[in-house]
């Protein structure tokens, strides 16, 4: 088993998924940006690039990395059974299905976990990146410019996000961002 040696959002998302499908994992290991891996012969890698390099180097190994590293390194991926019982592959369609199916407004600020969402086409280990800003910033002019940038990115960043192997925020969620 190859895992992140450093704390990471990728590890948090992966262990968040594992806690959602295994009571034993939840009890013994839990979720976090860094965890004590129970595998006896586990190997740590620094960053996604370190995990990808170790998985490619160690015959018969298995690990987890951000999707962009799977594509960039021509790595083999596996299908997973999602919450609806279907076996799905990781791709922009299954990631978007997980995002669209999530109840974004169930907590303030849309800060929810979207792992293991219901839906026939959902990839079960999907996460979202969030932008966190002060409600009452010290420099309001800088904050206004940052908000303008992200507004531009939401409206015009589809091509760039796809080039980086990320999924652009579905239109239905872009409308919801005004409520945050």
Regions found by a protein language model. Name each.
Residues 25-26, 37-39, 104, 123, ...:
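Tryptophan-centered motif/residue detector
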Residues 1-7:
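Short loop->beta-strand "edge-of-pocket" segments that line small-molecule binding or catalytic clefts
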């Amino acid at each position: 088993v190859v895992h992140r040696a450093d704390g990471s959002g990728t590890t948090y998302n992966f262990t968040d998924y594992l806690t959602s499908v295994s009571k034993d994992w939840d009890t013994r290991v839990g979720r976090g940006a860094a965890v004590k891996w129970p595998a006896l012969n586990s190997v740590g890698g620094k960053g996604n690039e370190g995990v990808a390099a170790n998985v490619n180097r160690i015959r018969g190994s298995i690990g987890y990395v951000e999707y962009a590293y799977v594509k960039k390194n021509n790595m083999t991926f596996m299908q997973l059974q999602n919450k609806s019982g279907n076996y799905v592959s990781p791709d922009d369609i299954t990631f978007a299905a997980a995002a669209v199916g999530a109840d974004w407004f169930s907590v303030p600020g849309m800060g929810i976990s979207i792992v293991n969402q219901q839906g026939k086409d959902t990839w079960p280990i999907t996460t979202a990146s969030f932008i966190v800003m002060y409600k009452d910033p010290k420099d309001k002019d800088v904050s206004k410019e940052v908000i303008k940038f992200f507004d531009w990115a939401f409206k015009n960043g589809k091509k760039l996000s796809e080039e980086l192997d990320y999924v652009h925020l579905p239109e239905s969620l872009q409308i919801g961002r005004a409520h945050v």
